[in-house]
């Protein structure tokens, strides 16, 4: 049944305006973005099928264009709408972890890194630069590709830290497999970076590995002394 034929106030847009966005299901929220469906499939049904196809909202919003646009009812325009929504969410997270903010809440850092790095189809190694009071200076993506001990260069990390006058850092990278468990290579990289940063009296506070649903902290495991 077309949404226009639903009882008054039951359509996702009307429900959002009356009750607020928090009262909508994932499919209903997505339907508001999609605006319309296709023949025999209303926007909510289309949204539900997309979520099922990709296994969740996050995977859908992180999927490449060719994977999304190959599905019936989703062309470049709808893909652009979805990407705009995803980018807005990332920018909200960026504002939540803005320059000058003191990192006193580990959950805030985890949420930010999850939004930035989870579900990337490639590995990203990044660094969160902090001042002596552990206030945020900048978040920088340093390396992309296969992250191993040969592809992460401590001298580049040290150079950036000196340039930004950071006093402490948190490094992080994602596992495209979705499994956050650190590898032996991750532990070797961490040790090399810690030793390199120690030569300029900068503290490595943590190395966080981002998976699909969790983040593993080296500091919490006692791997950074």
Swiss-Prot record:
GO terms for biological process: proteolysis. PANTHER family: DNA REPAIR PROTEIN RADC, UPF0758 PROTEIN YEES-RELATED. Signal peptide: none annotated. GO terms for molecular function: metal ion binding; metallopeptidase activity. Keywords: Hydrolase, Metal-binding, Metalloprotease, Protease, Zinc. Pfam families: RadC, UPF0758_N. This is UPF0758 protein Shewmr4_3597. Zn(2+) binds at residues 173, 175, 186. The keyword Hydrolase applies. It comes from the Bacteria. Belongs to the UPF0758 family. A motif (JAMM motif) lies at residues 173-186. Residues 102-224 form the MPN domain.
